[in-house]
């Protein structure tokens, strides 16, 4: 079983690793942003409690997996950014442009 120092060391190493690969491209050429949100880790006699806030991601969009002693917490949220392009020559002609961007969150612990 991992000690608290192993977990904290993994969290620390993951922060640096995520900085190196913060923006990558997957097979479908979509940009994926890996984010390691702040976490509170509490160890009791019989539990390891990890608390984190995943802003903009609902419970049904979060996947939690434990495989080969590796905990993975993963989720995806879609943000809609509305940009308004105002035509200075004609104020009645406003073009609205909606840009959808997908953000993926994934954290893995051994």
Curated annotation (Swiss-Prot):
Biased composition (Polar residues): 101-110
Pfam families per record: HSP20 (PF00011)
Membrane-spanning residues: none
Record has RNA-binding as a keyword: no
Region (Disordered): 78-110
Keywords, alphabetical: Stress response
InterPro entries per record: A-crystallin/Hsp20_dom, HSP20-like_chaperone, HspG1-11-like
Domain (sHSP): residue spans on this chain: 30-110
UniProt biased composition (Low complexity): 85-96
UniProt record similarity statement: Belongs to the small heat shock protein (HSP20) family.
UniProt protein name: Small heat shock protein hspG11
Organism: Dictyostelium discoideum (Social amoeba)
Originating gene: hspG11
